[in-house]
């Protein structure tokens, strides 16, 4: 059995290009250098705490308060960074065809934002508005009896606070977009939304409605 569950995200397409969102070099640096370093740092930090070795990065981040005060913030930073990136890479598809939400997800977006088109617009504008060095999140609400989606923004590698449950994230650190999009974060956000596996997003929403 592996000692740690801390590994860089593994997109469905490996580390190849995800055009027009990111070229191969950007993806390779993003996964192996940026996230790889976070994984290496976290393994060192939790080495003496076996109870943490089998946990996912998100759970380690949320349970960092159980660790000695001296390393808590470093653990939150490294574990949070890994978790943020897992939500970024989770639904990305490598083919260059445009992907749009299906009927069911479009209905949830309509209920939450007015329409799927309105959601795309709001998401792009929020990405433009945010300063670099954080994440833009699409979340569900744990206290809502009807599935509703909300946007949340976080600085650094922080995760959204309760009652928000992360669904996916947009990385707004410069390493994710600067090479292909410069400062045009609206275009970057649009490219991201059109490379998502919306059927997989739908499956996650269904699982949450069923208590999964």
What are these regions (language model features)?
Residues 1-212:
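Feature for soluble, non-membrane regions of globular proteins
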């Amino acid at each position: 059995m592996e000692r740690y569950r801390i590994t860089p995200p593994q997109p469905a397409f490996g580390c190849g290009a995800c055009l027009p969102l990111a070229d191969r070099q950007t993806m390779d640096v993003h996964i192996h250098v940026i996230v790889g370093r976070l994984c290496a740092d976290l393994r060192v930090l939790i080495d003496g705490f076996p109870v943490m070795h089998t946990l996912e990065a998100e759970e380690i981040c949320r349970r960092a308060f159980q660790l000695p005060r001296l390393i808590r913030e470093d653990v939150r930073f490294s574990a949070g960074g890994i978790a943020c990136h897992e939500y970024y890479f989770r639904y990305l598809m490598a083919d260059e065809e445009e992907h749009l939400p299906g009927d069911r997800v479009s209905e949830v977006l309509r209920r939450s934002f007015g329409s799927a088109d309105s959601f795309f617009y709001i998401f792009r504008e929020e990405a433009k508005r945010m300063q670099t060095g954080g994440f833009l999140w699409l979340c569900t609400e744990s206290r809502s009896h009807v599935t509703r989606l909300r946007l949340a923004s976080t600085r650094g590698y922080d995760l959204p606070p309760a009652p928000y449950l992360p669904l996916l994230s947009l990385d707004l650190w410069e390493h994710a977009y600067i090479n292909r999009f410069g400062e045009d974060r609206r275009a970057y956000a649009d490219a991201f939304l059109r490379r998502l596996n919306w059927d997989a997003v739908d499956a996650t929403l269904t699982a949450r409605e069923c208590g999964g």
